[in-house]
Amino acid sequence: MERKHMSALSIYQSLSGGKTPQAEDKAPPAKKVKRKENGVRPSKKATKKKGTKPLKSSVRSSSSEKEKHEGERDCREMNGKRFDNVALDILLTDLAKVNNSRDRANRLFQWLIHPVQDKSFFRDNWEKKPILIQRQNADYYKGLFSTAEFDRILRNDDVQYGVNLDVTSYTNGKRETHNPPGRALPYTVWDFYESGCSIRMLNPQAFSSTVWQVLSVLQEKFGSMAGANVYLTPPGTQGFAPHFDDIEAFVVQLEGRKHWRVYNPRCEDEVLSLVSSPNFSQDEIGEPVMDVVLEAGDLLYFPRGFVHQGDCLPDAHSLHITISSYQRNSWGDLMLKLMPAALEVAMEEDVEFRKGLPLDYLQYMGVQNSEKEDPRRDRFMAHIQGLMKKLVSFAPVDAAVDQKAKDFLHDCLPPLLTAEEKAGSVYGAPARWGDSEALDVAVELKSQTRIKLVRAGAARLCSDGDTVHLYYTTENSRVYHKEASKSFEMKTEHIDAMEFLIHSYPKFVSVASLPCETAEAKMSLAELLFEKGLIFTAEPLTAQ
């Protein structure tokens, strides 16, 4: 007797008692007590208030004809071809010839948002409002990622449910995740897809060299980690509930079509949100300020805090990749590192910060006393404000920036070296095993050897006051934070030379030109950086 086929979704539901866990359960609204806290105004609720002035609506944006012509003129950088006529593989090959990684990042970003100009985008849209870029060119992003590559990755790589891939659905206002345990194999994944589930790959850069290359270049544009998710949605379905994110999102349509609705932040507290939201119901989000269909080759950008949802049209599947950045990269995040350090310095250097609190301050300060009218409260608050003003002068801003930079370098993808860079680096060194012995190991840098960093942002000097460390990205994993942050302590004799090398980028400089006191110190630094993959030579090294 022939057994009736059960879908992967049906099997999973039967094993879990017909219930599926929700990955993003709708959280109940937090109950906030409206009270004064030591003179600080109470927090606003995360819902629209009556009489609150609505945020200025975003409008569907398209570049003006003037911008379009300027964009076409300015973008004739890739061998005289406009971006809309250049395939991605050719673009990446041409970018490899650009000797400054920051220039590469600028040009790749310009390709991403073409024909909108970089300056106008950051002036008018970045962190402000969405923009839709329609191209009528289905092949514009061809080569970035595809369903064929998705299938290849499932067949050849160890893709784990819940770690690298999610199976999701959103029906009748309910968002569910259907991840079974273990490896995500094509047989099960495509069965989920046939059952109407969306498939999300959480870190395609770990499996796709092209995505890795694009993100590793763009992270130098943003000065913040660039990440990506890939979403494959069956026709006529929706995989996710309305929500907002804590990142700047670039939705790149790769295949098929998808209907998107974007909504203004619901209140001022959610503008440029620091955290992603729970799932919203349809009646919590208001009317969309953008209601569009993305075709292959189109791009949709929206800032963090903008609510959005996407559903697939009945006549086509949808494959898109969301490129993201600027997570926890605000002034406030820098201040979180700066203020504790400033207070520590102030307490060491200024006796006013070490003087004891008033003997009776508990009698008139604190929440239970916040409604009292007491002149002692006024004097207390005035003294606090005076100390806060003085605190600014103790703020170690550069040290706090370095703390942010250390986090960024840990977040970074390692650079994907060009053929020229690899040939001149430790990764292209001729050392190998053959004829039962190690061959061509004797490769030596010389004083006249010209070297430079592999990337402008590949390394950074940071000091903790007593020692100086060099933090670097070349040994990072393509999997986020799989490895600990990479650094090593710099010898005093090497610090000036390392700073010289960083500031010399993108020029090649000879080992002899490094400002160390001895030739031995110059060579030892160059050899250390070469072994760490941080530098490459102008001409490939040969065995002696």
From Swiss-Prot:
The JmjC domain, residue ranges: 197-342
Pfam families: JmjC_2, RIOX1_C_WH
Binding note for cofactor: Binds 1 Fe(2+) ion per subunit.
One GO cellular component, as annotated: nucleolus
SUPFAM superfamilies xref list: Clavaminate synthase-like
Catalytic activity: N(6),N(6)-dimethyl-L-lysyl(36)-[histone H3] + 2 2-oxoglutarate + 2 O2 = L-lysyl(36)-[histone H3] + 2 formaldehyde + 2 succinate + 2 CO2; N(6)-methyl-L-lysyl-[protein] + 2-oxoglutarate + O2 = L-lysyl-[protein] + formaldehyde + succinate + CO2; L-histidyl-[protein] + 2-oxoglutarate + O2 = (3S)-3-hydroxy-L-histidyl-[protein] + succinate + CO2
Composition bias type Basic and acidic residues, residue spans: 63-78
GO biological process: negative regulation of DNA-templated transcription; negative regulation of osteoblast differentiation
InterPro entries associated with the record: JmjC_dom (IPR003347), NO66-like (IPR039994), RIOX1/NO66-like_C_WH (IPR049043)
Transmembrane segments: none
Predominant place of localization: nucleus
Subcellular location: Nucleus, Nucleolus; Nucleus, Nucleoplasm
Gene3D superfamilies in alphabetical order: 3.90.930.40, Cupin (2.60.120.650), JmjC domain-containing ribosomal oxygenase (ROX), dimer domain (1.10.10.1500)
Names of the cofactor(s): Fe(2+)
Region annotated Disordered, chain positions: 1-78
Chain residues that bind Fe cation: 243, 245, 308
Start-end of Basic residues biased regions: 42-53
PANTHER family documented for this protein: MINA53 MYC INDUCED NUCLEAR ANTIGEN, RIBOSOMAL OXYGENASE 1
Function: Oxygenase that can act as both a histone lysine demethylase and a ribosomal histidine hydroxylase. Specifically demethylates 'Lys-4' (H3K4me) and 'Lys-36' (H3K36me) of histone H3, thereby playing a central role in histone code. Preferentially demethylates trimethylated H3 'Lys-4' (H3K4me3) and monomethylated H3 'Lys-4' (H3K4me1) residues, while it has weaker activity for dimethylated H3 'Lys-36' (H3K36me2). Also catalyzes demethylation of non-histone proteins. Also catalyzes the hydroxylation of 60S ribosomal protein L8 on 'His-216', thereby playing a role in ribosome biogenesis.
Family: Belongs to the ROX family. NO66 subfamily.
Protein name: Ribosomal oxygenase 1
Species whose genome carries this gene: Danio rerio
Organism ancestry: Eukaryota, Metazoa, Chordata, Craniata, Vertebrata
Gene this protein is translated from: riox1
